[in-house]
Amino acid sequence: MAGRSRRRSFWSVGVAAALLCLLAAHGCSAKHHKPKPTPGGISGNASSSSSNSSTPSIPPPVAPTPTAPTPPIPSPGTGSSNGSSGGGGGGWLNARATWYGAPNGAGPDDNGGACGFKNVNLPPFSAMTSCGNEPLFKDGKGCGSCYQIRCVGHPACSGLPETVIITDMNYYPVSLYHFDLSGTAFGAMAKDNRNDELRHAGIIDIQFRRVPCQYPGLTVTFHVEQGSNPVYMAILVEYENGDGDVVQVDLMESRYSTGGVDGTPTGVWTPMRESWGSIWRLDTNHPLQGPFSLRITNESGKTLIADQVIPADWQPNTVYSSIVQFD
């Protein structure tokens, strides 16, 4: 019996070691992302992310059915998203964390991710990003959510909270809640000058809580995606204070007018469909007429209207900033 028990123990250790190697190799590689829908039903895969975190490429496992509830929507005043150590007590949940990509990078080689955000190495994301498993990523509805995280149980942990934004997905069966962090975000949880020591730990225990997102000086921004055309509009929504995520986007066209004068709004809202991540799309059987107004709804049910934020002469792969923001 003792020998049988010992064999079981060795087997368990082996499985844990194999899982650690698997995570180190992949993180939330772009290979795991949903294919990006494009006009005409053609789809393609994003490029692979960095493999700096250790072993050869191997296929990802099938995602398990999540059993953990999604974290609660943050209340105003519960923490902050600026990385400070203050902000409300309680509400901490247990999770595990890994990291991928370059040690001081933002995760993916292309500084993107399954949410569709771009240049997450730059402010306001500043590489403080994370992949989330299903209770965090929520099939894309969790994109843009902000979480305070703090590591526990390792000598290099500072114990101070840092704030990360969900920009990518990872469905590896590590724990009920799993943050696969950028190298920058993982190292930020360490004591001074012990960042590399903490990163070398691989998988660590952390605590987390959802907090309101704060983007000082920024308004809600809309990026018209490459491939958009008169009968297909795809829009990335960014920089929403509060919940940080979006559960519905609606578009209002303008009436056609002659003489080069912009038309007035039609007053009719057309629901857009979630394409992938934080990108919403509208396919039509008629040429869309701008300027376009957009109405976004967050997880708390609050709505925000950006009147005629996208002009009639809009262009693909262009950013249009609104003058509105969630309170």
Curated annotation (Swiss-Prot):
GO terms for biological process: plant-type cell wall loosening; sexual reproduction. It is found in: Secreted, Cell wall; Membrane. Residues 231-322 form the Expansin-like CBD domain. Disulfide bonds join C115-C143, C146-C213, C151-C157. It is a peripheral membrane protein. Residues 112-218 form the Expansin-like EG45 domain. GO terms for cellular component: extracellular region; membrane. This is Expansin-B7. The lineage of its organism: Eukaryota, Viridiplantae, Streptophyta, Embryophyta, Tracheophyta. The gene is EXPB7.
